[in-house]
UniProtKB/Swiss-Prot annotation:
Protein name stated in the entry: Deoxyguanosinetriphosphate triphosphohydrolase-like protein
Family recorded in the similarity comment: Belongs to the dGTPase family. Type 2 subfamily.
Designated gene of the protein: dgt
A Pfam family annotated for this UniProt entry: HD
Keyword Hydrolase: yes
UniProt keyword terms in alphabetical order: Hydrolase
Keyword Hydrolase in record: yes
Residue intervals of the HD domain: 65-196
Cross-referenced NCBIfam families: dGTP_triPase, PRK01286.1-1
Disulfide-bond pairs as recorded: none
GO annotation terms (biological process): dGTP catabolic process
InterPro entries per record: dGTPase, dGTPase-like, dNTPase_2, HD/PDEase_dom, HD_domain, PHydrolase_assoc_dom
One Gene Ontology MF term: dGTPase activity
Amino acid sequence: MRSNLAPYAVSDTNSRGRRIHEELPAGRSQFQRDRDRVIHSTAFRRLEYKTQVFVNHEGDLFRTRLTHSLEVAQIGRSIARNLNLNEELVEAITLSHDLGHTPFGHAGQDALNDCMKTYGGFEHNLQSLRVVDVLEERYATFNGLNLCFETREGILKRVPKSKAAALDELGTRFLHGHSASLEAQLANLADEIAYNNHDVDDGLRSGLITLAQLEEIEIFARHLHQVKQHYPDITGRRLIHETVRGMINTLVVDLTVQSGTRIRDASPDSPDSVREKPVLIGFSDTIKRQQQELKRFLHKNLYKHYQVMRMSNKARHTIEKLFTTFETEPALLPYEYQQKFQEYGHQAIADYIAGMTDRYAIREYQRLFAITEN
């Protein structure tokens, strides 16, 4: 761990610790240990075959939840270093924030949430926490990964008060309107930077959106013009890459400068004092407006594109069919999950489906419903 952390940064010495006590790791900080445990987890490896926007088999070059998580971690660490925050904590949060995502991206989550409405619903942040607290089975003396409080808290972006009470100390900030650590705030916005800009990149690669369309979007048009001015002969993938690269750099610089100013003005002197302040990590008003314009464009032209909607519809059908089949006949679950169904009820079905990769979900559907000669 760096020795020049700001007093308001989370550190080993002011961490609230782990649910189950462990001796301090040799040669690593507490949050390096958290990061390492996440990277070595089964759930993390599965992210390689979980959708970001495009279903995994649609192309080899589109982003997955794994590549997205790595990109978020890189952005988060860069900003954390400039703000003298705890880079290892930011990395641990960003690498674990999507562990609970279903197959097929948001279409899969929406479908599973609908299936679970009667049983408390489904939300991927809470499922990510469940993965690191309960579902990973790697260690001799505890379930889950036994991560530090601050890493676990950082996984949770939004939790309704109706569910926050069941989270004990983790739910306190949602019940009382307190802020999260600066590292958690940063991880949230690093996710937003990566998500929007890399969806632009993937959308252009897929051909579902075009440069001509994006030239109507202020932040993209400005950076496209700058790239063309600097490199008059640039075309194709290089032009797109340099434009997206410039957009990400602008957002990183803006977030760093604006957040640094807000932190100085608020003068927090400890991680606990941060919780009593309003959210301090944020963009300028201009960048927020431009980001919202880009989000609206992506929602209308990429996420609602008929080809993406077709993929989403197939994903929803697959998730719903798997859930209702297992609900009606739990004996069709793998034996391990039949046992868990006895203990957790429908949550066990949600755990099983949420843990699937895109490919596994498709194959499980085929195993259950496809009639073949074999």
